[in-house]
A protein has these predicted regions:
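Compact, charge-rich alpha-helical regulatory domains located at protein termini
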Residues: 1-41, 46, 52-58, 62-89
Length: 89
């Protein structure tokens, strides 16, 4: 989590433009959903991992289709909002 203190340019995954190459900085889950952290980490959202938003569902933008590493997942906006990312270098 030390990255998050240095990552002033970090934004949450749900706010990305489509096809923008990023990397995971950290995960910040709501207090009422602590189990989301482990679940997101288990499916590959770990610091340094490449991530890209591929598509948004309609209406309302749910779910989001996200590629992390070599895997593709559908996430709800609330879940994607827990993943902080920054531009891939």
């Amino acid at each position: 989590m030390s990255d998050h203190q240095n990552a002033s340019s970090a934004i949450t995954l749900d706010r990305l433009d489509l096809h923008q190459p990023m990397r995971v900085v950290d995960i910040q889950v709501p207090a009422e959903q602590p189990e989301w952290r482990l679940w997101l980490e288990e499916i590959g959202f770990i610091p340094g991992e490449p991530v890209c938003l591929l598509a948004r569902g309609m209406p309302g933008g749910d779910p989001l289709v996200v590629r992390v590493g070599a895997s593709t997942f559908a996430l709800r906006r609330a879940e994607a909002a827990c993943v902080r990312v920054e531009a891939a270098s």
